[in-house]
């Protein structure tokens, strides 16, 4: 799926770090989000630079990019990983949306961006942990990382992303914990998803 420049006719694009970013007619920036899991069914969880805020890698689609190209570009820029370090397990069937809080919306921007719509990629990590490197971008997103239990991100993600994280994790759980016998034998079955009010 290529995000075409036709978007510009109905909505528009704006320049972010010198690159045209795609915004749909409703004001949502098109992007990808990435969940990486390892052999122990733990998830890659990264800390934003100089903040006590943790999240999954994510980023916006540049005009003319496919979603897969965007995902691999963001993967490299934000984590240092290459395509051979991961295997694509699945991609969300639908766009998952989140709206920005009012104080984060740049009301003077044209076109107006009110949030993000994301395709979520589930990747299995098959590389070496020494490949993780946050210094490949001029403006690194992260400065620390850890492997965490499956639902752990729901405890720490910023409140306005909580619902979209919940939907993605719920949709991907059956891919991470594929076989019932494996779940029981290794004690790796995730607990039921936490409620969004928690």
Task: For each feature predicted by the language model, list its residue ranges.
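A short gly/proline-enriched turn/hairpin at secondary-structure junctions
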Residues: 55-59
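Unchanged
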Residues: 61-159
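A conserved beta-turn-beta hairpin within the catalytic core of GNAT-like acetyltransferases
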Residues: 50-52
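Gly/Ser/Thr-rich helix-start
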Residues: 32, 60-61
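Active-site beta-strand termini and strand-to-loop segments that position acidic
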Residues: 36-39, 48, 123-125
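Charged phosphate-binding loop/patch that engages nucleotide di/tri-phosphates or the phosphate backbone
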Residues: 154-198
């Amino acid at each position: 799926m290529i995000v075409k420049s036709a978007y510009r006719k109905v909505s528009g694009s704006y320049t972010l770090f010198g690159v045209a970013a795609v915004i749909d007619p409703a004001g949502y920036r098109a992007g990808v989000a990435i969940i990486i899991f390892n052999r122990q069914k733990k998830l890659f969880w990264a800390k934003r630079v100089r903040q006590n805020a943790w999240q999954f890698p994510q980023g916006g689609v540049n005009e003319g990019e496919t979603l897969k190209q965007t995902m691999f570009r963001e993967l490299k820029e934000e984590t240092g990983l290459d395509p051979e370090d991961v295997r694509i397990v699945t991609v969300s069937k639908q766009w998952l949306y989140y709206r920005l809080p009012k104080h984060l919306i740049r009301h003077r921007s044209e076109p107006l961006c009110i949030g993000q719509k994301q395709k979520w990629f589930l990747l299995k990590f098959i590389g070496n942990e020494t490949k993780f490197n946050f210094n490949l971008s001029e403006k690194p997103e992260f400065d620390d990382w850890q492997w965490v239990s499956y639902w752990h991100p729901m405890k720490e993600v910023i409140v306005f992303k909580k619902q979209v994280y919940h939907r993605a994790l719920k949709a991907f759980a059956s891919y991470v914990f594929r076989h019932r016998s494996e779940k029981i034998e290794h004690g790796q079955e995730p607990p039921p998803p936490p409620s969004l009010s928690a």
